[in-house]
Amino acid sequence: MAFSSCLKFYPFSISQAVTLTHHSFSLNLTPPSSTISFASPHSAALSSTDVKLLDSLRSQPDDSAALRLFNLASKKPNFSPEPALYEEILLRLGRSGSFDDMKKILEDMKSSRCEMGTSTFLILIESYAQFELQDEILSVVDWMIDEFGLKPDTHFYNRMLNLLVDGNSLKLVEISHAKMSVWGIKPDVSTFNVLIKALCRAHQLRPAILMLEDMPSYGLVPDEKTFTTVMQGYIEEGDLDGALRIREQMVEFGCSWSNVSVNVIVHGFCKEGRVEDALNFIQEMSNQDGFFPDQYTFNTLVNGLCKAGHVKHAIEIMDVMLQEGYDPDVYTYNSVISGLCKLGEVKEAVEVLDQMITRDCSPNTVTYNTLISTLCKENQVEEATELARVLTSKGILPDVCTFNSLIQGLCLTRNHRVAMELFEEMRSKGCEPDEFTYNMLIDSLCSKGKLDEALNMLKQMELSGCARSVITYNTLIDGFCKANKTREAEEIFDEMEVHGVSRNSVTYNTLIDGLCKSRRVEDAAQLMDQMIMEGQKPDKYTYNSLLTHFCRGGDIKKAADIVQAMTSNGCEPDIVTYGTLISGLCKAGRVEVASKLLRSIQMKGINLTPHAYNPVIQGLFRKRKTTEAINLFREMLEQNEAPPDAVSYRIVFRGLCNGGGPIREAVDFLVELLEKGFVPEFSSLYMLAEGLLTLSMEETLVKLVNMVMQKARFSEEEVSMVKGLLKIRKFQDALATLGGVLDSRQPRRTYRSR
C-alpha cells in the first residue's frame, strides 16, 4: 500500500542529500557507547545445561574462544540449545565484526529448526551498523525473507530505518521506504518519526511537514518526538521562527511537553545568541507546565552566554546549577573555559580548569586543546607545552589538534627546530599529522628560506597519504618567488595539474607577482591570460602586481594602461592601485599630475591613506615646494581614517632638514614627531644637528638629543656616554655614538608587498 498520499505530490526523495555531512539531532551530551547490547526477546526458562553453557560463553575472554566453546558444545549428541544461546554467541561475534561466522550460526539455527524471529536478525543488522556497513543491511533483509521465510514487521522496519538514518545512509532510507508496501508493513508513529528525521537530515523540511500533517489520515497522532524532530530540523537550518511555528502546532494538538522539547527551543534561542529570550521561554514553561531546568538546560544556557561573551553571567548560571543539585560537567566547564579564552582571559580560564579538577570533574582533550590553542596564540608556548605534559600525565593522549596548536605556536615564535622535534614525536606516538600540520611546517621552512627541506616535507606528506591542497602549493610557490626562484616556482605550479589540485586566484597572483618582481613581466602577462582561460578572473592583486612593476620601471604609460584595463574588466581600482600609480608618477617627476590624481580619488569618495599621500609629499619637497608639502601633511592629520604614519613624519622631517624651510620649523617638527611616538632617521637628524651647530644653537641640539634618547629608550650607560661627549663639546663624537645606538635600535628592514 502507498505509505502516504501526500507523497504522490511530494515524493520521499533524498538523493540530493546522500553525501551530506551527518548532523546529529541527539540531545545527549555524552558520545554514544561504541558497544552495542541487545536484550534477548526469548525470556523462557532455560534448562540447567543451557544456563551453564550461557554462563560459560559469557565468561570467555574473547569472541574466538566463545565460538570455539559453542562449536564444541554443538558436537555433543542431542545438542538443541534455546534461542537465547544462539543470540548470545551472535552478540559476541557481532561485537568483533565476525559477520561470516554470524551468518553460519543463523544457518545452523535454521537447519536445527531452532525457533527464529526477526529479532535474531536485528543482531546482525545492528552489528553491521556498528561497523558503519549500512550498505549490507538491505541484503540481510532480503536474505532473511528469501532464505528464512521471515518478513520484517513494523518494529523491525523501524529499527532498521533508524540505523540507516543514524548512519547517514539517506539513499538507503529512500530505497527502504520504496520497499515498505512490498514487505506489507503497516506504519506506526515511530515509522513516521524516523522518516521525518531522515527528511530533516536531508534538509527537506517541507516534505517533513507534509508527512507530519498526513499522519491523522492513517489514524495516527503525532507525538512529542514527531514535533521535536521537526523543531530540531528547523533550528539546524537556522530557522528558529519555523521551529516556534511547529511549537504552536504542538500546543494545538494538545501534545504534552517534556524537558526534551523545551530544551530544543532553548537550544534554538541560544544558538542565535538570544539567551534572554531563552530565559523568558524557560520562565513561561515553568509557569504553564511546571517545567524545571535540567542538566542539559543549564549547559545550553551556559554555552549560549559564553558564546555571546557574557561569561560572568554564565558563571552565575553555574552557581544556580549547583544550588539546584546539578554538578557542572565537562561540557559546562568547557563552555566557560572556551568563553574566557575567546575574551583573552587565559589566566581566568586556567583558574576554572583548576576549579574543575578540584570538584572531581575530569577535563578531556577538548578542555586542554582549548587552553593550549589559546596559550599558543598568545605566544605563551612554554605554558602551553607544560599544559600538554599535564594532559599526558593524566592519561589523556594528545590528539592532532593538540600537536597542531603547539607546532603552530612554535612556528609563529620562529622556534622551528623544536616544532620539527614535536612533529617527529607526534608521529612516533601514532598520531598522524594532517594537512594543517604539514602546511604549517612547509610555511615555516619557506619563511626561513629552507626551500629544499620544504620540498622534502611535501614528499613526506605524499608518502603519509595526506592529500596535498591548493594551500600547500600556494605556500611553496610563495616561498620560491620570495627567494627569487621563479623557475622552480613555475615547476611547482605545473605539478599542481599533474596531482589534480585546482589552482585558485591566490596561486596565479602569487606567481604573477613573483614574475613581475623578477622582471619577467611578459611571462606574467601570459600567465594572466592563462588565468582567464582557466576561468579565474584577475582581481586587484593581479593588476596591482603588474602596475607596481611598470611604476618602478618608470613606464607610466603602461601603468596607466593597466589601470584602464582593470576598470574595463569590471575590477574597480582601490587605494593601493591609485597609491602605486601616484608613486610611479612622482618617481617620474610628474608630481603635478600625481597631485591632480590624488584630488580625483578624493572626489570619488575613496579614503586616502599614507600610501597615496606620502609619494606626493616627498615629490613636493624634492621640487622645493615646502609650503604645499606641509599643507598636504596637515591635511593628512585631519583625516581620522588614515593619519600620517612613521614614513610620513620621516619624509617631512627629511624635507625640512634638507633645506626645505626655516631651521626652527624643522626643530618644532622633530618635537612633534617624537611626541607622536616615532624616532627620526639618523641621517635627517644629523643634517639638522649640523645646521644647529652652524647657527651656534648647541643648547637646542642638546635638548633634542636628550628627547631622542628618551624616546629610543637608551640604556643608562648609553645616555651617560652621549651626555659626557656633549658636555665636553665633542658634538661630532656624540652624534656618531647616538647614530650607532639608533642603528642598533632600528635595524634596516626589508618590506615586501603582499
UniProtKB/Swiss-Prot annotation:
Main location (coarse class): plastid
Gene3D superfamilies found in the cross-reference section: Tetratricopeptide repeat domain (1.25.40.10)
Subcellular compartments: Plastid, Chloroplast
One GO cellular component term: chloroplast
GO molecular function: mRNA binding
DNA-binding as UniProt keyword: no
GO BP: embryo development ending in seed dormancy
Location of the transit peptide in the chain: 1-72
Keyword match Chloroplast: yes
UniProt entry keywords in alphabetical sequence: Chloroplast, Plastid, Repeat, Transit peptide
Coiled-coil ranges (or none): none
Family: Belongs to the PPR family. P subfamily.
PANTHER family membership: PENTATRICOPEPTIDE REPEAT-CONTAINING PROTEIN 1, MITOCHONDRIAL, PENTATRICOPEPTIDE REPEAT-CONTAINING PROTEIN 2
Protein name stated in the entry: Pentatricopeptide repeat-containing protein At3g53700, chloroplastic
